[in-house]
UniProtKB/Swiss-Prot annotation:
<feature type="active site">
    <location>
        <position position="263"/>
    </location>
</feature>
<comment type="function">
    <text>Plays an essential role in chain termination during de novo fatty acid synthesis. Possesses high thioesterase activity for oleoyl-ACP versus other acyl-ACPs.</text>
</comment>
<dbReference type="InterPro" id="IPR049427">
    <property type="entry name" value="Acyl-ACP_TE_C"/>
</dbReference>
<dbReference type="InterPro" id="IPR029069">
    <property type="entry name" value="HotDog_dom_sf"/>
</dbReference>
<keyword id="KW-0934">Plastid</keyword>
<keyword id="KW-0443">Lipid metabolism</keyword>
<dbReference type="GO" id="GO:0006633">
    <property type="term" value="P:fatty acid biosynthetic process"/>
</dbReference>
<feature type="active site">
    <location>
        <position position="265"/>
    </location>
</feature>
<keyword id="KW-0276">Fatty acid metabolism</keyword>
<feature type="active site">
    <location>
        <position position="300"/>
    </location>
</feature>
<comment type="similarity">
    <text>Belongs to the acyl-ACP thioesterase family.</text>
</comment>
<protein>
    <recommendedName>
        <fullName>Oleoyl-acyl carrier protein thioesterase 2, chloroplastic</fullName>
        <ecNumber>3.1.2.14</ecNumber>
    </recommendedName>
</protein>
<dbReference type="GO" id="GO:0009507">
    <property type="term" value="C:chloroplast"/>
</dbReference>
<dbReference type="GO" id="GO:0016297">
    <property type="term" value="F:fatty acyl-[ACP] hydrolase activity"/>
</dbReference>
<dbReference type="InterPro" id="IPR045023">
    <property type="entry name" value="FATA/B"/>
</dbReference>
<keyword id="KW-0444">Lipid biosynthesis</keyword>
<keyword id="KW-0809">Transit peptide</keyword>
Length: 367
């Protein structure tokens, strides 16, 4: 039995009654039609009535939202400035620790940021480009990324990520994130980033014009809101240059085609993996990444060959006491169980810096 909802049959009746076409009656076998009450959304159906070359179609009768919008677990908050989305950790997103990798976390941060700006009407042709940016061939590129993970989600865990953006002076914009465990509401991570504008044709940085700023400021909180509100938090620490010779190295890293993004260069998440390639194996075996900070200094293209260098940060260079995100003071005992490293990514050909980094590792906990 063919079943159509009452809503759909009404649409069909109105369509034929309002049409100016003249339809030649066609004798067809009578088929029973039953109507039923819809419990959730009205049926999105397609019906065709063919005679010769003519075709009448009724489709997607309810809303103008796209299938992607209906499948996402994301929404703008009531203030209209921040955006939240839920993600389930999939099996291919976990690593040797049976938890999500830092690359997975970074990819989710990028995904929720892109979904946020797409939700408010920015273009999907590039990362959050406004109308003026598209006219002037301008794109956003990452200048700095700082991620702190207090607890890594495991396979099948659901993570809720909140994000928002705001102006960062005359040269760029800032985006922050807060990650929560959906099951407990516990904050399991925070992140912040700085973005600058680049001309897509010349590949040179460009100041943010008033016209572009006016286009995105309407979606930024009127008052500053920071994921790391403390003035002395580690996200603000300057990363010194790593001097030769480095203690650890991984030479000759080559970008894969899959590492390139829609901005025609190596995506910022790939740099995280390259930095970790030169971490000593004994640290990987006994520790997990707690904090990573990256300063992006130069874009990397597909034909570039990259060297990853790492050196332990000496105790004198490590701040022994920092105010934590909950207002507590980090104990020296806790610092003793952690390892700190400085990193640099540079071109193999001429030694030009691509990226500077700092990582902080804690002892693995038993699960």
């Amino acid at each position: 039995m063919l079943k159509l909802s009452c809503n759909v049959t009404d649409h069909i009746h109105n369509l034929f009654s309002n049409s100016r076409r003249i339809f030649v009656p066609v004798h067809r076998q009578t088929r029973p039609i039953s109507c039923f009450q819809l419990k959730k959304e009205p049926l999105r159906a397609i019906l065709s009535a063919d005679h010769g070359n003519s075709s009448v179609r009724v489709a997607d009768t309810v809303s103008g939202t796209s299938p992607a919008d209906r499948l996402r677990f994301g929404r703008l908050m009531e203030d209209g400035f921040s955006y939240k989305e839920k993600f389930i950790v999939r099996s291919y997103e976990v690593g040797i620790n049976k938890t999500a990798t830092i690359e997975t976390i970074a990819n989710l941060l990028q995904e929720v940021a892109c979904n946020h700006v797409q939700n408010v009407g920015f273009s999907t042709d590039g990362f959050a480009t406004t109308l003026t940016m598209r006219k002037l061939h301008l794109i956003w590129v990452t200048a700095r990324m700082h991620i702190e993970i207090y607890k890594y989600p495991a396979w099948s865990d659901v993570v809720e990520i909140e994000t928002w953006c705001q102006s960062e002076g005359r040269i760029g914009t800032r985006r922050d994130w807060i990650l929560k465990d959906c099951a407990t509401g516990e904050v399991i991570g925070r992140a912040t980033s700085k973005w600058v504008m680049m001309n897509q044709d010349t590949r040179r940085l460009q100041r943010v014009t008033d016209e572009v700023r006016d286009e995105y400021l309407v979606f930024c909180p009127p008052e500053p809101r920071l994921a790391f509100p403390e003035e002395n938090n580690s996200s603000l620490k300057k990363i010194p240059k790593l001097e030769d010779p480095a203690q650890y190295s991984m030479l000759g890293l080559k970008p894969r085609r899959a590492d390139l993004d829609m901005n025609q260069h190596v995506n910022n998440v790939t740099y995280i993996g390259w930095v970790l390639e030169s971490i000593p194996q004994e640290i990987i075996d006994t520790h997990e990444l707690k904090v990573i900070t990256l300063d992006y200094r130069r874009e990397c293209q597909q034909d570039d060959i990259v060297d990853s260098l790492t050196t332990s940060e000496t105790p004198n260079e490590v701040v022994s006491k920092l105010t934590g995100t909950n207002g507590s003071t980090t104990s020296s005992k806790r610092e003793h169980n952690e390892s700190h490293f400085l990193h640099i990514l540079r071109l193999s050909e001429n030694g030009q810096e691509i990226n500077r980094g700092r990582t902080q590792w804690r002892k693995k906990s038993s699960r």
